[in-house]
A protein has these predicted regions:
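Conserved, well-folded catalytic cores of nucleic-acid-processing
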Residues: 60, 79-83, 98, 113, ...
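P-loop NTP-binding site
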Residues: 218-338
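Canonical P-loop GTPase G-domain recognition
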Residues: 146, 155-214
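Conserved glycine(s) of the Walker
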Residues: 49, 189, 280
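Conserved G1/Walker A P-loop phosphate-binding module
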Residues: 30-108, 112-114
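Conserved C-terminal guanine-recognition region of P-loop GTPase G domains, centered on the G4
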Residues: 108-177, 252
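Residue-level signature of catalytic and energy-coupling elements of molecular machines
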Residues: 43, 47, 53, 76, ...
Length: 338
């Protein structure tokens, strides 16, 4: 039995490599005046590594990542342009139970992102068995759109034979067109995945300029970077109870002056974020400022404030005032895209 599994696993990997090569040839056969161009939604359970995968595929850090679930709250685009294709990725929040008004709106975003796409990438953690929550998440996929199963984190799977029953179970749940094992964190299998994706896209003209990376305004990126700094420095429930509002944005030739308010639900959360003598807020600010300077390629003066807005995740008026899709004020104007 063991020998049979080893042989099957070997055949699986060999087949994937051969298929990727064939798809590469198929892509390269497209006339250079045309490219394969289309929209690809990235879906999956929380903590499957969707945002890490998006960053790895695009080659830039445009989505926040952390070791906690539900770090992505909105769907947004990352664009990969190669000589053969232009792929517009739509990252989405993790598919999960909608237990708050904010989460219900997030799931509305997911459902919208799974409609009218050229392809869906369903990303799963290859180290985890299929659970009831996974089955429910897969059932949310649109069967009228082709989907590729992406088995992420394979660098953590020592026995690759374990991938076979995982693939089999997922293909029983949904008619996935293909299965591709990758490690987004280790950049393994990404070229193969890009070839697979492009092979399903139609020929067409470029939708965005070749140097275009994301559709998100700089204010959104700043708010997300602050939220990621909170996620990386503060544990437990506090990060998920935060909404970031960029209050002011001033730009000169030498620096950016940015002020943002971190909204939390309880006084205790505010105390945790500020920390002893303001040390935690200072740490969060430093983490965010360094990342912002990397993004903006300029000095950044960042001011952070913490305010209590009780039960904001269930407050429709607050969610409407503070655009829940971007965590920015409704009066904010979009800046030039990076």
């Amino acid at each position: 039995v063991a020998q049979t599994l080893v042989f099957a696993a070997s055949r699986l990997i060999s087949t994937l490599i051969v298929n990727a090569a064939a798809q590469d040839r198929k892509i390269n056969s497209v006339p250079k005046t045309k490219r394969r161009t289309g929209f690809v939604s990235i879906a999956g359970r929380p903590n499957a590594g969707k945002s890490t995968l998006l960053n790895a595929l695009v080659g830039e850090k445009i989505a926040i990542t952390a070791y906690q679930a539900q770090t992505t709250r909105t769907s947004f685009q990352g664009v990969l342009t190669t000589p053969e294709a232009q792929i517009i990725f739509i990252d989405t929040p993790g598919i999960h139970k909608s237990d708050s008004l904010l989460n219900k709106r997030m799931m509305d975003t997911v459902r919208g992102a799974l409609q009218d796409r050229d392809l869906i990438l369903y990303v799963t953690d290859a180290t985890r068995p299929v659970t009831e929550e996974d089955e429910q998440a897969v059932s949310a996929l649109n069967k009228s759109v082709k989907a590729v199963l992406v088995l992420n984190k394979i660098d953590k799977v020592e026995d690759k034979r374990l991938l076979l029953p995982l693939i089999q179970r997922y293909t029983e749940l949904f008619p996935f067109a293909e299965s591709v094992p990758v490690s987004a964190a280790k950049a393994q299998g990404l070229d193969q995945l890009k070839a697979v994706i492009a092979s399903y896209l139609p020929e067409g003209d470029l939708i965005f300029p070749e140097d275009y990376i994301t559709d998100q305004p700089l204010r959104f990126m700043a708010a997300e970077i602050v939220r990621e700094a909170i996620l990386r420095n503060v544990r437990e429930e506090v990060p998920h109870a935060t909404a970031i509002l960029v209050d002011t944005w001033e730009e000169t030739k030498r620096l950016f002056k940015i002020a943002a308010t971190i909204h939390v639900e309880r006084q205790g959360q505010k105390i945790i974020l500020i920390g002893n003598k303001g040390e935690m807020l200072k740490k969060i600010g430093t983490t965010a400022r360094l990342r912002l300077e990397e993004l903006l390629q300029r000095k950044v003066f960042l001011s952070l404030f913490v305010a209590v807005k009780p039960n904001w995740r269930e407050d429709p008026s607050f969610l409407n005032t503070v655009d829940w899709r971007t965590m920015l004020g409704s009066e904010s104007k979009a800046e030039e895209k990076p």
